């Protein structure tokens, strides 16, 4: 698959076939992802690739704590809730997803079930947890580096026919993840990525989120014309 085809074709997948992904394929994808650039080649990332019963325990723990009203316990969280144009885009993609799934605005049960899917990692057969070394906590560069490797990972997965969705729901109850994935205290849990073979019959998987135009995002300085 050509690079342009990967970038233009990739989408976030929220429905998966219950079909295992081999360790060999996952190692190949991670090897490609880790060619991502990092500040001064620090390579701050670690990956916890989880499947089977350990992943099921995380799903159960996440769901139980959320339903019990436990507060968000993410270890990496900066900034304020989205507002303005950023909030508009967040709401826009939510509307696309709800429309695809046939979930009405007043369908409280349907909306709750959709939210809980996220805490179950969208029932994907694999979850990848990205962490970084705690000694780098507060670094300006480390979040950027982890974002770069996550982007490389999801593109590498797509090029092999695998779907992904980068998400925060899977790590919102970080104590559960840390316990069942065996993550040491000297690492900070940053992000989760659900991964597996896409279920092409799952309506939300057909959603293509909108993007700003180059004209809206880029300023060209010193060019003629």
Regions found by a protein language model. Give the residues of each.
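Acidic, surface-exposed loops and disordered segments
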Residues: 1-225
């Amino acid at each position: 698959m050509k690079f342009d085809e990967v970038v233009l074709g990739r989408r976030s997948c929220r429905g998966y076939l219950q079909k295992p992904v081999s360790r060999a394929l996952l190692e190949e994808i991670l090897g490609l992802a880790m060619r991502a650039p990092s500040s001064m080649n620090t390579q701050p990332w670690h990956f916890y690739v989880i499947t089977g019963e350990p992943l099921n325990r995380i799903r159960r723990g996440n769901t139980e704590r959320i339903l019990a009203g436990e507060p968000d316990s993410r270890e990496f969280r900066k900034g304020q809730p989205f507002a303005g144009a950023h909030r508009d885009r967040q709401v826009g993609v939510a509307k696309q997803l709800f429309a695809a799934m046939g979930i009405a605005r007043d369908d409280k049960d349907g909306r709750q079930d959709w939210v809980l899917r996220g805490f179950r990692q969208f029932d994907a057969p694999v979850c990848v947890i990205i962490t970084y070394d705690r000694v780098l906590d507060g670094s300006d560069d480390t979040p950027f580096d982890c974002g770069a490797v996550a982007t490389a990972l999801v593109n590498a997965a797509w090029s092999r026919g695998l779907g992904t969705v980068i998400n925060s729901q899977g790590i919102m109850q970080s104590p559960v993840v840390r316990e069942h994935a065996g993550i040491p205290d000297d690492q900070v849990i940053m992000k989760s990525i659900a991964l597996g073979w896409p279920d092409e019959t799952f309506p939300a998987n057909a959603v293509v989120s909108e993007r700003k135009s180059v004209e809206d995002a880029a300023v060209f300085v010193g060019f003629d014309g």
